[in-house]
Amino acid sequence: MARGNTILCLRDQETGAETYECMIFALRKFTGGMGDEDEQQPEDNKVWTDYFLKPLDSTAKVICTRKANGEAAHLAIRFIENKFVLCVGSKNVHMLICDKSDIDKYSDGRFQVARAVAAAILNVINDLSEESVEFLCNFMHHLRLTAVFEILNPCTQHVEDLSHLERSELRFISWTSSYEDRKNNAHSYCAVNPQVGIDLAQKIGFKTVRYDIIQPTEVDERMDKIRHDYGYEGEVLYFLDSDENVIGLLKKKTAWYVVARAIREQVANALNDWNKSGSSKYDHAAREERLVKRLKAIKQWLDLSESSLSAWIEIGKGFLAYVIKLAEKSAKDNQVSVESEKCDGVSQKAFSNGDIELRNKFPQHWKTFLQQHQKSDRIMW
């Protein structure tokens, strides 16, 4: 099952006849090893090969792309009733637009991310040359492609710091297309070789993810390097056969990202608990215990050393205490803002009663905590 499946229904106004077409068909299911999923983990470090279209030993080369730490974003274009129509969105929420004024027609809350994607895509298209826009529209219409992006939004940051961005930006990842025949047979996860696809996107004028090309014999070394790297989420590896078909994908995340994200989630949950229960009923020791339990589980998945685990536990506990103190100070000072922050035209809930929107602002709070306490999250293992 592909991500973001979206079916377009066209109804003839005279005859009432309906035709259906798959408009969005993004990347299909792929996974990683233990520790590479955000929630439930695979049973072992080889489950990812179960999703391959061919045996792993059919691999002729591997393309490694940097994993952007944002939200999924999709684009499809069709020529309908003498004009190009864009289908844009994220995950399973998409909308049809022709220009910026159409975005406001999708006011329901579930379109929040889709609206941000739409605005970012139109910004990119407006910056392209007329020749590139004409090529893009005709290319995507005639080949029935989906363009897969990641949207980096400085208002909704995860673990990587995006504060340097003035507005949301897209990073092109790949071109995809729907099944090749009615029997749902598929020979490749991507419409073209990812290297060719990224190079083409760059020529059109898109910003893209970075990539490297390695040999199949270098995969284990590459995965180990990624795991030990610092400061970014990880990489996605595309396995290609001798015919340039993408026969499988693998996500591999840095240990830094896996642990930092776990701390973010544990501390955010503790903050929610503090806000709901109040300082008198909030059990800090219990929250510390949950944090430690989670980090010990990650140690097993990633095979971290005892010394690195101890270092992460110390930092995690310190950050938990730091955030709760911020919440207590905010509540004590009664810092309630009546103004809502705005980013890319989307209103964001302002700070009030200790709610510091930790999940969306984690990188800044994390960085401030480390600086104030003279700590480093560059932990060797």
Residue ranges of model-derived segments:
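Core nucleotide-handling region used for phosphoryl-transfer chemistry
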Residues: M1-W381
